[in-house]
Design a protein with these regions (language model features):
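Long, aromatic- and glycine/proline-rich binding clefts that accommodate carbohydrate-like moieties
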Residues: 138-141, 297-301, 347-399, 403, ...
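Glycine-centered hinge/linker elements that transmit conformational signals in sensory
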Residues: 187-188, 226-254
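Periplasmic solute-binding protein
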Residues: 111-119, 139-175, 203-223, 312-319, ...
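Short, solvent-exposed loop/beta-turn-alpha elements that line the ligand-binding surface or hinge
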Residues: 124-137, 198, 217-236, 286-292, ...
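Conserved N-terminal structural module of periplasmic/extracytoplasmic solute-binding proteins
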Residues: 2-18, 22-112, 129, 288, ...
Length: 431
């Protein structure tokens, strides 16, 4: 999965009138119909998978084959939709009442928004919510809205510092940097002593959050309905990024498709460190400098700022479209795809982190050493605000970050502009 949160999103979208699938109350189909006996369920389930089509999609399709073998009366229409396009594409289809999938692999930050618009079917009391006691609490919370379950957690993730052990060793370091100050020093030493770049940045809002969290900042203060993106703490965090760029500790960022550029440079050994998540494990291990030497691939928690080490909690949920004509089949599909057995298989083959506790101890998961490597980074994961407007907060910030990385602005005015944009999204919130 490539986490690139740059699809256009404006506040007006939140006020769109909901058509056939609901009235915008987030209470579509408030009492789900009693599910049919599994053996009698038939139909076709269209699933929009937003994972990486090359590295992840084939594994999910293997599990689909197992599902169809268990439920021969149900067929799955698998559609891979690029992550960057999926949010807007689903909203357009759901609003029109035509073309929406039965099941969507939904970013955790989209669930509250889609539920508030009436686009999602409530899942409580259906087979989709199976053995909820097994779920890790924070990933499970991402699927809740107004006290109801609209999504069940498929995978969880966060950001870590990924590093090339050999390049760090050549620069004189046996361990990765533990603080943001050390990050700059190590990156500059790698640059001067090895000829490789020290750090590559992904110019995307999600990837700014470890720097902001590290100084005690955040997008918003939900409890007090306050916009905090331009607070002194958030400013201090983004100033660290600005300094990494201007000092040369970070290579000059690509402003277009920066994710791919940073990832490719890391896999090819042209830079020593990047921030990325467990979804990139398979991609990285296929790279030139790691393919024949997987032990060279290091994973560590994001370096700590003056307040803490913190990176955003991410992941994906399975959600069911409220207007689906195949609800019973969709519930069974979600149940199967999200079982501990399926999660363990996904963890073993892709290194993606399960959301069910039993999956972590399953032999298929423990066979992949990357699962254990992500335990420490996950300890620093920060829960994001599960509010309907959450996904819309990324676009103004990424636009500002691009200007900052391109040298068109500096931290303080950039974040003031972002805060002003947030006032148009978060009606009634204070600065």
């Amino acid at each position: 999965m490539r986490r690139v949160l740059t699809s256009a999103a404006v506040a007006a979208a939140l006020a769109l009138a909901v058509t056939a699938c609901g009235d915008g109350s987030g209470d579509a189909g408030s009492s789900p119909a009693k599910s049919a006996a599994p053996a009698e369920v038939s139909g076709t389930v269209t699933w929009w998978d937003t994972s990486d089509a090359t590295t992840e999609g084939p594994v999910f399709q293997e599990i689909i084959k197992d599902f169809e073998a268990k439920y021969p009366k149900i067929k799955v229409n698998y559609v891979n939709v690029p992550f960057a396009d999926a949010r807007d594409k689903f909203k357009t289809a759901a609003q029109s009442g035509s073309g929406a999938p039965d099941v969507l692999r939904t970013d955790v930050g989209w669930v509250a928004e889609f539920a508030s618009l009436g686009y999602l079917a409530p899942l409580d009391g259906t087979p989709a919510v199976d053995k909820p006691e097994e779920f890790l609490p924070v990933p499970a919370a991402s699927g809740k809205y107004n006290g109801k379950t609209y999504g069940v957690p498929q995978v969880t993730d966060t950001l870590g510092l990924l590093y090339n052990k050999e390049l760090l060793k050549k620069a004189g370091y046996d361990e990765p940097p533990a603080t943001m100050a050390d990050l700059k020093k190590v990156a500059l030493d790698v640059k001067s002593k090895t000829g490789a770049g020290g750090l590559a940045l992904n110019v995307d809002a999600y990837f700014l959050l470890p720097f902001i969290y590290g100084e005690g900042g955040d997008f918003v203060d939900v409890q007090n309905k306050k916009i905090t993106i331009s607070s002194p703490q958030s400013v201090a965090g983004v100033k660290i990024v600005e300094d990494l760029i201007t000092s040369g500790a970070a290579v000059k960022p690509a402003l277009q498709d920066s994710y791919t550029n940073a990832e490719t440079a890391f896999k090819d050994g042209k830079v020593a460190m990047i921030f990325n998540g467990p979804w990139s494990n398979a991609d990285n291990l296929g790279g030139k400098v790691f393919k024949d030497n997987p032990d060279n691939f290091g994973v560590a928690p994001v370096p700590a700022g003056s307040a803490k080490a913190g990176s955003p909690l991410g992941g994906h949920d399975y959600t069911v479209y409220a207007g689906s004509k195949n609800l019973d089949a969709s519930y069974l599909f979600v149940q199967f795809m999200d079982s501990a057995e399926s999660q363990a298989k996904i963890a073993g083959k892709l290194g993606l982190l399960p959301t069910r506790q039993p999956a972590y101890s399953a032999s298929e998961a423990t066979a992949n050493p990357k699962i254990a490597q992500w335990a420490k980074p996950m300890e620093t994961a920060v829960e994001r605000p599960w509010i309907p407007e959450a996904a819309s907060l990324f676009q103004p910030l990424v636009e500002g970050y691009q200007k900052l990385a391109g040298g068109q602005t500096t931290t303080e005015p950039m974040l003031k502009d972002v805060a002003t944009a947030y006032q148009g999204i978060l009606k009634g919130w204070s600065l």
